[in-house]
């Protein structure tokens, strides 16, 4: 009897599934003709040659009620992406009152460099604070602007939220501050910073790592105790900036936290000892800790400030675990997943993508990675070509699902670093996107 039922129902099921699939495809095809028309009418042109920035006025309406604006990027190594973001940052600061810029770079490095900005050239501040992939003329212009704004009394404050650091950047600045109070403690700090930077790379066994780590943790605990007991003297010698003492203390504690969690996992993975749960890999742990750092910046360091975030699309998008397919094909949690809902509600997240061109590979800042061109049919990059402009912005957050916008609400391909296919529902990952027709590799300056 069961076999008879199967024989009778299986053909019917196949027909139903086939019809359902055909209907969905037919419906999508019928809606596609409306997509181009909607994009032509509603994609906001961006004109870098417009000195008055009239083309950016739409941001006042789009960002209403949003305390945090996240500016993503499909690749770290493209000049046009950097230039677009720098221009938007200036507008956001001058016209909409965003006064903090948080980079995807080390918290200790960015804050120490900002505190010492008065003593450094814009180029030196840039090199001491953010990763080398952004050491370009476009970004020097941003740091020049930050220095000017600080001198005018309307600062655009630099900070960071990453747990990875650059050797010597925080070390040089912090050692000078401590040396004025206690030269011996300054030497302890300098040596600890040097040992911290090589803790994983110079350890060959887990026991060796553990012994070095325990010694370093004790060193930083001594430095934290010293900082607390000599708070008034240190504050006299720290740069005369609000929160300088809090930044210094947090940087010291962060060193301990990173050693006890992220570096511990890095060492295990170096020895090919892998965790059972995907979120415990150092790759995903970094995003969790970046979310924690950003939360501290937003809630404790600058609780009343409006904040701009500069980072990669991957880290900033809303919820990587809801991706259909991400670039590593694991859909593990990203920084956006880990942020608390109350901060997410205050945030407008912008992804940036490119139609053609090339960018640098950030692994060496030399290798050129071409953008897949033409992009896949039906992809985000391909669809926004219909705007027939060199650069456009499209708002997702305030756009309802209808015939002309269904592409935002249905599975869509977009390219990571311009050449690796990811699949997502755009509305779930971004509040808006910037599309650039062409990008070129960044020129890294020495």
Curated annotation (Swiss-Prot):
GO MF, one annotated term: hydrolase activity
EC number per UniProt: 3.-.-.-
Pfam families xrefs: Erythro_esteras
Superkingdom assignment: Bacteria
Keyword Methyltransferase: no
Signal peptide: 1-28
SUPFAM superfamilies hit by this protein: EreA/ChaN-like (SSF159501)
Keywords: Hydrolase, Signal
InterPro entries, alphabetized: Emycin_Estase, Hydrolase/PRTase-associated
One Gene Ontology biological process: response to antibiotic
Classification via PANTHER family: ESTERASE, PUTATIVE (AFU_ORTHOLOGUE AFUA_1G05850)-RELATED (PTHR31299:SF0)
The protein's name in its UniProt record: Putative hydrolase YbfO
Gene name tied to this protein: ybfO
């Amino acid at each position: 009897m069961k076999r008879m039922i199967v024989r009778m129902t299986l053909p019917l099921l196949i027909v139903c599934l086939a019809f359902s699939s055909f209907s969905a495809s037919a419906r999508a095809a019928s809606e596609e003709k409306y997509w181009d028309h909607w994009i032509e009418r509603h994609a906001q042109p961006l004109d870098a040659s417009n000195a008055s920035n009239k083309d950016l006025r739409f941001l006042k309406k789009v960002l209403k009620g949003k305390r945090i604006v996240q500016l993503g990027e499909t690749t770290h190594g493209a000049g046009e992406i950097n230039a677009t973001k720098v221009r938007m940052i200036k507008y956001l600061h001058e016209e909409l009152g965003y006064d903090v810029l948080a980079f995807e770079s080390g918290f200790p490095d960015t804050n120490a460099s900002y505190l010492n900005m008065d003593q450094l050239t814009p180029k030196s501040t840039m090199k001491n604070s953010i990763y080398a992939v952004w050491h370009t003329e476009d970004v020097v212009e941003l740091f020049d602007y930050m220095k000017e704004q600080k001198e005018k009394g309307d600062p655009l404050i630099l900070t960071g939220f990453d747990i990875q650091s650059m050797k010597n950047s925080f070390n040089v600045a912090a050692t000078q501050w401590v040396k004025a109070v206690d030269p011996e403690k300054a030497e302890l700090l300098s040596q600890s910073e040097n040992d911290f930077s090589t803790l994983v790379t110079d350890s060959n066994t887990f026991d060796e790592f553990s012994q070095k780590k325990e010694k370093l943790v004790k060193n930083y605990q001594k430095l934290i105790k010293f900082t607390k007991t000599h708070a008034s003297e240190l504050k006299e010698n720290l740069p005369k900036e609000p929160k300088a003492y809090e930044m210094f203390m947090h940087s010291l504690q962060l060193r301990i936290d990173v050693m006890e969690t992220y570096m511990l996992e890095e060492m295990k993975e170096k020895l090919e000892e892998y965790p059972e749960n995907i979120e415990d890999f150092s790759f995903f742990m970094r995003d969790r800790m970046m979310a924690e750092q950003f939360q501290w910046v937003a809630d404790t360091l600058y609780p009343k400030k409006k904040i701009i975030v500069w980072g990669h699309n991957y880290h900033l998008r809303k919820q990587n675990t809801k991706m259909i397919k991400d670039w590593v094909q694991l859909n593990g949690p990203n920084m956006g997943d880990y942020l608390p809902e109350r901060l997410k509600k205050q945030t407008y997240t912008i992804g940036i993508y490119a139609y053609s061109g090339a960018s640098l590979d950030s692994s060496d800042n030399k290798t050129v990675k071409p953008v897949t061109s033409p992009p896949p049919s039906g992809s985000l990059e391909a669809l926004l070509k219909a705007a027939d402009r060199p650069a456009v912005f499209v708002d997702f957050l305030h756009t309802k699902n209808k015939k002309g916008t269904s592409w935002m609400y249905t599975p869509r391909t977009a390219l990571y670093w311009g050449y690796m296919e990811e699949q997502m529902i755009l509305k779930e990952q971004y509040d808006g996107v910037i599309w650039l027709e062409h990008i070129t590799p960044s020129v890294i300056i020495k």
